[in-house]
């Protein structure tokens, strides 16, 4: 059981890293916030299309990551 949970945790971790890297950036970064791009940084921007799907997958994988981590902590 322990080996299965560790294997699942590694798979979820790698998938989470890949999905986060595939997401597009939402702002110009820190330089945009300092030089007057704050309206874009704090404005409401809804994800559409592929960004929405990647966002939802990220949330699901993050929840799985925490559940698996807590499960492994209690098994040890």
UniProtKB/Swiss-Prot annotation:
One GO-annotated biological process of the protein: protein secretion
Chief place where the protein resides: membrane
Transmembrane segments annotated in the record for this chain: 2-22, 56-76
Membrane topology reported for the UniProt record: Multi-pass membrane protein
This protein's record includes keyword Transmembrane: yes
Coiled coil: none
Gene Ontology CC: one annotated term: plasma membrane
Alphabetical keyword list: Cell membrane, Membrane, Protein transport, Translocation, Transmembrane, Transmembrane helix, Transport
Subcellular location: Cell membrane
Induction: Constitutively expressed, part of a 5 gene operon with multiple promoters. Not ethanol-stress induced.
Keyword Transport appears in the UniProt entry: yes
Source organism, top-level taxon: Bacteria
Molecular function per GO: protein-transporting ATPase activity
Cited function: Involved in protein export. Participates in an early event of protein translocation.
PANTHER family registered for this protein in UniProt: PROTEIN-EXPORT MEMBRANE PROTEIN SECG
Similarity annotation: Belongs to the SecG family.
Protein name listed in UniProt: Probable protein-export membrane protein SecG
Protein species of origin: Bacillus subtilis (strain 168)
